[in-house]
């Protein structure tokens, strides 16, 4: 069983270590659309055995990322996730548990962010993956990802 999670993805533009929230916006230069995939049965087994989750979330083709990038401000318009042209989820930055600046600041405390690092912002929902489905992710009115599940 595989589940998909749509994301707004941030690209870092500079080296960042212990960046305060008020300066975090300076560390992001672009946003992209992403979808991550998780093998739920493998994840459940790893959790049950107290093992790492790597195999459940880090397999071949476990993530899709748009090639096109938009300016940082584009994320304020939010993202739309569609399956077979039906809107399944709208991701609004303002509805997230933590602000983007808080996420970037906190991550920079845990690890050094490097130029070009990608930050997949949390996804509110998961969707069961079915062969033959078409996925689209748009930020604002621009479709950045459009692919079929095979």
Where do the PLM segments sit?
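Catalytic-core "active-site belt" of small-molecule-metabolizing enzymes
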Residues: 1-114, 118, 125-150
């Amino acid at each position: 069983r595989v589940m998909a999670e749509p994301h707004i993805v941030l690209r870092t533009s500079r080296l960042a270590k212990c960046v305060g929230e008020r300066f975090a916006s300076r560390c992001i230069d672009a946003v992209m659309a992403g979808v991550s995939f998780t093998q739920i049965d493998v994840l459940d087994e790893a959790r049950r055995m107290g093992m790492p989750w790597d195999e459940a979330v880090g397999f071949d083709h476990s993530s899709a990322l748009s090639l096109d990038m938009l300016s940082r401000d584009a994320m304020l318009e939010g993202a739309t996730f569609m399956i077979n042209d039906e809107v399944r989820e709208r991701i609004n930055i303002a509805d997230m548990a933590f602000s983007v600046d808080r996420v970037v600041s906190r991550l920079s405390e845990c690890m050094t962010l490097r130029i070009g690092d990608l930050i997949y912002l949390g996804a509110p929902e998961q969707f069961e993956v079915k062969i033959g489905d078409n996925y689209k992710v748009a930020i604002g009115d621009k479709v950045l990802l459009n692919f079929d599940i095979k």
